[in-house]
Amino acid sequence: LPRIPLVASRADFVAVATAGRGLADLHQDYETVEPWELILTVDGKEVPWAQRDTIDPALLHVTKLRYAKTRVDGKQADDRSSIVYNEHVTLSGIPETAQDYLLGSRSGLDWLIDRYQVKPDKASGIVNDPNEWMAEGAGQGNMAAPQPRYLLDLIARVTTVSVRTQQIVHSLPPLDVRD
């Protein structure tokens, strides 16, 4: 069973409890947090984040997300501050701290890159296509309008959640735990 340590002071308890509430709210409401203002490049032209609704939905079809590439010591390496959405759209300006919050062994953005791709299920042969899901309203119900920008916003929101999580965790005082 998990053991909840007894902290040495009330101030430590209040700090941990407040951080815990903040983290719970942040993670439970991840789809409603303010999206991180990423830099959008569409067909080589920068589009301000606030104008992402002007992007033609036909340019938002995703097949497989990936990190952009950069050269480090003469070798190709992932540029984890930039995600190639498709051949038309790139998102950049992802803070390094967004990659520091890990869910298991990967960041939240790593999980998105892995999961939001067109991919057939090996056992059933059913194709998992996030484009169809977004066209059907992204889980908002039978009468929902298509949400072609859902994944753009989700990437930005996961970035916000990851950065804020790191801020909350790093704001905690060192704990004096009683045995």
Language-model features: where?
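Sequence-level detector for compositionally biased, low-complexity segments
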Residues: L1-D179
